[in-house]
């Protein structure tokens, strides 16, 4: 399981990431969904990309930021051009501070085909970032549950679009409720929890 250092996350949240002015403007002034991970089959970004035109029909003010590199990146960019949505897609190859993006994102979107169990999901939860995830094996369903975020059927376009619609139309109170539930569930991923657990095992 991933182990988080909460103090490091708090420090990073308050530091600006090194990004160009255009992306910085999106992060600070626009509504955007964030996705983090390599452009590979596992992360399933090509599937997610094919859903974005439908998502923009629900909310045409959205932008989409992806952090990562990988073998599918060039194909991803070509398809975004064909779909005529390249003005809404921004890719950051690498950053030392994902927490800055998570703090400002409307939601983290995790369209993966599988996870183990999803470190990005755990980090997002601790940054009070809403999570929209596939119900893929090894993590998301167990961590998010029914009240910690928004789950859609893995690799189902209709389910993803519908779930994002539910999120975009959800009340602020309901979104906060889910964020709080997720953060509570993530306590077992903190370094403090692991240190306390180890101490108890030694003493007992």
Question: What do the predicted segments below correspond to?
Answer:
Residues 31-54, 64, 71-77, 119, ...:
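A conserved mid-protein helix/loop that constitutes part of the nucleotide-sugar donor-binding site
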Residues 146, 150-157, 166-172:
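Conserved acidic donor-binding segment of nucleotide-sugar-dependent glycosyltransferases
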Residues 130-134:
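Short hydrophobic beta-strand element within catalytic cores of glycosyltransferases
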Residues 123, 136-151:
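Short acidic/histidine- and often glycine-rich active-site loop of Leloir-type glycosyltransferases
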Residues 1-13, 71, 96:
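Short beta-strand->alpha-helix junction loop in the catalytic core
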Residues 94, 113:
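Aromatic "clamp/platform" in nucleotide-sugar-dependent glycosyltransferases that forms part
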Residues 175-203:
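A charged, aromatic-enriched C-terminal amphipathic alpha-helix characteristic of glycosyltransferases
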Residues 9-26, 32:
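A short helix/loop element that forms part of the nucleotide-sugar donor recognition site in Leloir-type
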């Amino acid at each position: 399981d991933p182990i988080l250092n909460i103090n490091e996350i708090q420090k990073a949240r308050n530091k600006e990431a090194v990004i160009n002015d255009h992306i910085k403007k999106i992060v600070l002034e626009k509504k955007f969904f964030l996705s983090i991970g390599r452009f590979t089959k596992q992360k399933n970004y090509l599937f997610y990309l094919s859903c974005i035109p439908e998502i923009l029909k629900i909310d045409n003010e959205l932008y989409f930021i992806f952090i990562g590199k990988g073998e599918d990146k060039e194909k991803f960019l070509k398809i975004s051009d064909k779909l005529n949505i390249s003005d809404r897609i921004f890719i950051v190859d690498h950053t030392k501070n994902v927490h800055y993006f998570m703090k400002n994102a409307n939601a983290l979107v995790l369209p993966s085909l599988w996870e183990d169990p999803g470190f990005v999901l755990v980090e997002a939860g601790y940054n009070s970032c809403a999570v929209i995830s596939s119900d893929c094996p090894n993590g998301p369903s167990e961590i998010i549950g029914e009240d910690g975020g928004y789950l859609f059927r893995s690799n189902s376009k209709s389910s993803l679009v519908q779930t994002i619609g539910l999120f975009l139309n959800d009340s602020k109170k309901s979104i906060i409720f889910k964020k709080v539930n997720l953060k509570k569930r993530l306590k077992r991923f903190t370094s403090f929890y692991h240190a306390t657990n180890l101490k108890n095992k030694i003493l007992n």
